[in-house]
Structure formats: structure tokens, C-alpha cells
Amino acid sequence: MGRKRLVTNRRLVAIVDDEEDISVLFRDALKRIEGITIVPFNDPRIALEHFEKIKDAYVLVISDFRMPGLNGMELLRKMKDTNKYVRTILMTAYEIGDSIFSDYTKNEIINGFFQKPVRITDLIKEVNMQLHSYEIQKTFPSYPP
């Protein structure tokens, strides 16, 4: 008799950054959080393809802003269009136009933000908060009002 794998508790967290050292650093730091599987990507287009195949398994996407092929804000917008419950964090070392950024936060496309460099303790704290928010949103779909 074959062994069945339970995937119902599989909660994926994507890290999307074209700088491989950043995605590896974040992956290693977030391994400490129980109940999630970290999936690093260095190409936002590949991240989007993977996300679209198993969108309901993703609970959080952390993305850099400036990347070749597809910027982080557009990537997160496409992901939110596909799965409204997924939580998103944008990070950048650059300035972002206030009107564009406020539009994305107002429409809940971006749930969290980091200015690089990111302290690992801040990253872990924010990820835990976003995971908690995800669980609340899935349990109470009208939250927040």
C-alpha cells in the first residue's frame, strides 16, 4: 500500500529576488518558522508561473521591487488577482513613487513593506504577522471590513 502525503497543511511562502544571496539569506532565516515551506525564486516570471499552478498553497509572497522582466509591484498585483487571500510584502532599496505605492496599499495589493537592507528580526516578525493575518482572513473572509 502506498503512503499518502497530506498537503492540506502545506503553506508556501515565496521569496522573489533577482539577487540570489538575498533569497538564500531570507530562506535560511525563515526556516525557523514552523508550518511553512520556503520557495525561493530569482526570476519573477518563473515565480508567477509556479504561483498560478498551485495558487491556493501560497500564503505569503515576499518580493523585491526592481527585477528584470517584471517588477515586484506588478508581480504582486498579478498574484493577488489570482488569489485574493495571499499576503504580500514588497521590499526595495530604491524610492517608490508615493501615489503608486499608496494606490497599491489602499487596494491591499501590498500588505507589508521593507526598505532594504532588512534586519532578519524584523523580517521574521513581519512574516509571522502576515501569516496570522492570512489565517484570520481565511477564517473570516470579510475581515478587515
What are these regions (language model features)?
Residues 67:
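Receiver (REC) domain active-site loop signature in two-component systems and cognate sites
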Residues 118-127, 131, 135, 139:
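C-terminal output helix
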Residues 64:
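Active-site residues of response regulator receiver
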Residues 74, 95-112, 121, 125:
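Alpha4 helix (beta4-alpha4-beta5 surface) of REC/receiver domains from two-component response regulators
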Residues 49, 73-85:
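Short amphipathic alpha-helix used as the core "switch/output" element in two-component signaling
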